[in-house]
């Protein structure tokens, strides 16, 4: 009788999935047993696209719901966490046709974090993961790919142009596949900045000025240390003085990394 394989747990959001992906792809022939708890429902479609088999898939909205569902699972066997990888050796997402061909540098912009993270931070009284939409106009010297859900981008009132294009696919695989076209990324604390930093694309992160051990441990410190990411910490990004300071630092960073 074949011995049952140990259970591997993968939990979190889309950014976590991206860090789990290299291990999962490398170990597909071994067919590990995965229990997945995730607050981004689109991740389930990503598992299917990559042909990764999951034994149990559980979705949740907020952390208190996750704790309740974990208790209901009543996992009694030994398990391990899926190992994380900081960088992709090769981009696992199929490239898309280039959006721009005008010779200008292209930056990606992502204004919002996930609904889960936004709701949680409001509940905890922490700075929201949101950039003012006017940053798109203030960085108009570059081609811009604006990432986000359709309703998020529509709510900004921004318009597409020859140098501003929206990447708003409901199929998250398709949206993530456009990140590789960016020469640099300017983003809130979100999965898009995780994708760009894992591809070693220079990434400028606007992040709330609050303690967040897991955010810093997994999604910030490794990339800052590697020289891939630089951060600007804010209390309220829409406040004019803070915004202007963040914009200045963003422009200086882009000028530095894109001037070569």
Regions found by a protein language model. Give the residues of each.
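Conserved catalytic-core segment of nucleotide-activated headgroup transferases in glycan assembly
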Residues: 20-29, 114-146
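Short hydrophobic segments within beta-strands
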Residues: 9-10, 110-112, 147, 206
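Nucleotide-sugar donor-binding patch of glycosyltransferase catalytic domains
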Residues: 40, 194-260
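Nucleotide donor/acceptor-binding cores
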Residues: 3-6, 104-105, 142
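Catalytic phosphate/metal-binding cores of nucleic-acid and nucleotide-processing enzymes, i.e., regions
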Residues: 8, 15, 106, 170, ...
């Amino acid at each position: 009788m074949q011995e049952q394989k140990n259970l591997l747990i993968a939990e979190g959001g889309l950014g976590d999935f991206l860090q789990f992906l290299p291990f999962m792809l490398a170990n597909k022939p071994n067919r590990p047993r995965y229990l997945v708890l995730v607050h981004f429902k689109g991740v389930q479609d990503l598992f299917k696209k990559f042909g990764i088999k999951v034994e149990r898939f559980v979705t949740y909205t907020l952390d208190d719901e996750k704790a309740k569902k974990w208790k209901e699972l009543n996992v009694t066997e030994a398990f391990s966490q899926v190992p994380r990888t900081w960088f992709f050796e090769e981009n696992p997402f199929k490239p898309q046709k280039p959006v721009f061909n005008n010779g200008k540098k292209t930056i990606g912009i992502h204004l919002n974090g996930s609904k889960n993270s936004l709701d949680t931070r409001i509940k905890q009284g922490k700075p929201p993961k949101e950039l003012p939409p006017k940053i798109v106009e203030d960085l108009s010297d570059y081609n811009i790919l604006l990432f986000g859900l359709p309703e998020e981008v529509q709510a900004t009132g921004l318009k597409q142009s020859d140098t501003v294009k929206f990447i708003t696919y409901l199929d998250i695989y398709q949206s993530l596949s456009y990140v590789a076209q960016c020469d640099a990324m300017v983003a809130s604390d979100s999965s898009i900045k995780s994708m760009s930093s894992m591809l070693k694309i220079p990434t400028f992160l606007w992040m709330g000025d609050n303690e967040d051990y897991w955010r810093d441990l997994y999604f910030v410190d490794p990339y800052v240390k590697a020289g891939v990411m630089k951060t600007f910490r804010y209390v309220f990004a829409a406040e004019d003085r803070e915004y202007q300071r963040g914009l200045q630092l963003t422009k200086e960073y882009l000028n530095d990394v894109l001037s070569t």
